[in-house]
């Protein structure tokens, strides 16, 4: 019998893997990708030895040295798997690593499953995990690869973002949203665009302090990993889930992967920290402690493009005009930390104009690194022609609806400008 470990399986040709799949009686093996087939073989091999093959996201108990793999929603549950301190040290495992391996059921006096052997770390050979560079040691750069979000002609939100506030791999973006301005619909459109256009990227949707029915809606609408801590959970759980998601994203970036976190919302995460941290003795307007900003800023500031390969993109919503002074202070504190902002306009939403994007106030820093020069010239021309008329956004979107792609929209604008220049020259 051949050696059944992830390193040996990765070195096998597809024909050899198919032979093993037939040996283990795996159904539909020809329809699986190589990575899926490898994990199906590992699982079948474990079951043959009367063991389970399970995986989860590692959370290390710092004071004790051992840890638990969290298989469900990055949160503690009865399905957690115990992993010993010696295994953590041997493979240089870190918080947020997704660890897969053979697991035995709990004995009489035990509460948790026990991990017997580490088969894979973040989908790779565990030995290669030792050679990873730590996330803080990686070199951050400005985003220089555009993440194209345009998909279907009727998805105007993502088409407008590509034009007016382009998103790059490694972007740190704020979606500034008043209530009832279409924030949730926008997040779903962005998530589905990422899934369609960037299938290789790792997408995580993080929902903090949201309504349970909204979580269900997004889980059913989005193909990525949806992680949530609903408003009926304690603030400590919001913080633990958010920090483990960030650690998970960092570990993937260390493996040179492009990771995208869509977060709703940074405002509620900052509120949770304000309730949990020890008081510093100082209070800002709205009743928020200045010390409560440190860890949410660490979360948001982790977004970066990496010179050595990979990137972490964070698009987080910030709530404004909620009637709470604290929410406005939180937005003001985060306003200068991002390198892209997308503003939603409540007045447009009240007039039933969707997407309710404030085109004038939305934009990206260093957009010249993302957008081709000919598109950039057209974009600046559009910005120059923007009037203060409240009907401008409505006219702009009406014109967009008549075109199927952004390229077609730019071509029509070019023709209109040429005709306008000719008529002015004749005069």
From Swiss-Prot:
Record-listed ATP binding positions: 168-173, 180-185, 211
Superkingdom to which the source organism belongs: Bacteria
CDD domains assigned to the protein according to its UniProt record, in alphabetical order: Rho_CSD (cd04459), rho_factor_C (cd01128)
Enzyme class: hydrolase
PROSITE patterns: RHO_RNA_BD (PS51856)
EC number of the protein: 3.6.4.-
A biological process term (GO) from this entry: DNA-templated transcription termination
Subunit structure and binding partners: Homohexamer. The homohexamer assembles into an open ring structure.
Function: Facilitates transcription termination by a mechanism that involves Rho binding to the nascent RNA, activation of Rho's RNA-dependent ATPase activity, and release of the mRNA from the DNA template.
Sequence similarity: Belongs to the Rho family.
Name by which UniProt lists this protein: Transcription termination factor Rho
């Amino acid at each position: 019998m051949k050696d059944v470990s992830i390193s040996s399986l990765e070195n096998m040709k597809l024909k050899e893997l198919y032979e093993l799949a037939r040996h283990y009686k795996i159904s539909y093996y020809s329809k699986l990708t190589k990575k899926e087939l490898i994990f199906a073989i590992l699982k079948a091999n474990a079951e043959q030895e009367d063991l389970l093959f399970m995986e989860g996201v590692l959370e290390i108990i710092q004071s004790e040295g051992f840890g638990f793999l969290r298989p469900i929603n990055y949160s503690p549950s009865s399905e957690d798997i115990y992993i010993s301190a010696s295994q953590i040290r041997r493979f240089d495992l870190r918080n947020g690593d997704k660890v897969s391996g053979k697991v035995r059921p709990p004995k009489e006096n035990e509460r948790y499953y026990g991990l017997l052997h580490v088969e894979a770390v973040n989908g790779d050979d565990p030995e290669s995990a030792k050679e990873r560079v730590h996330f803080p040691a990686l070199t951050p750069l400005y985003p220089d690869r555009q993440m194209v979000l345009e998909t279907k002609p009727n998805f105007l939100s993502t088409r407008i973002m590509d034009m007016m506030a382009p998103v790059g791999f490694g972007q740190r973006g704020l979606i500034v949203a008043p209530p009832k301005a279409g924030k949730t619909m926008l997040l779903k459109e962005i998530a589905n665009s990422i899934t369609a256009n960037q299938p290789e990227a790792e997408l995580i949707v993080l929902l903090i302090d949201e309504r349970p029915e909204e979580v269900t809606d997004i889980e059913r609408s989005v193909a990525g990993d949806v992680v949530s801590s609903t408003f009926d959970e304690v603030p400590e759980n919001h913080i633990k889930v958010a920090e483990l998601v960030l650690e998970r994203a960092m570990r993937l970036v260390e493996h040179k992967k492009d990771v995208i976190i869509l977060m709703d919302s940074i405002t509620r995460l900052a509120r949770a920290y304000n309730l949990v941290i020890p008081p510093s003795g100082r209070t800002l307007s709205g009743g928020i402690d200045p010390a409560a900003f440190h860890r949410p800023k660490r979360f948001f500031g982790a977004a970066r493009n990496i010179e050595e390969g990979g990137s972490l993109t964070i698009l987080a919503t910030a709530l404004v005009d909620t009637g709470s002074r604290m929410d406005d202070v939180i937005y003001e504190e985060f306003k200068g930390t991002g390198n892209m902002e997308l503003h939603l306009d409540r007045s447009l939403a009240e007039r039933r104009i969707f997407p309710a994007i404030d085109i004038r106030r939305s934009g990206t820093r260093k957009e010249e690194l993302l957008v081709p020069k000919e598109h950039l010239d057209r974009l600046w021309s559009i910005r120059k022609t923007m009037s203060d008329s409240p009907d401008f956004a409505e006219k702009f979107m009406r014109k967009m609806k008549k075109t199927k792609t952004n390229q077609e929209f730019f071509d029509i604008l070019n023709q209109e400008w040429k005709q306008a220049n000719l008529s002015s020259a004749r005069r």
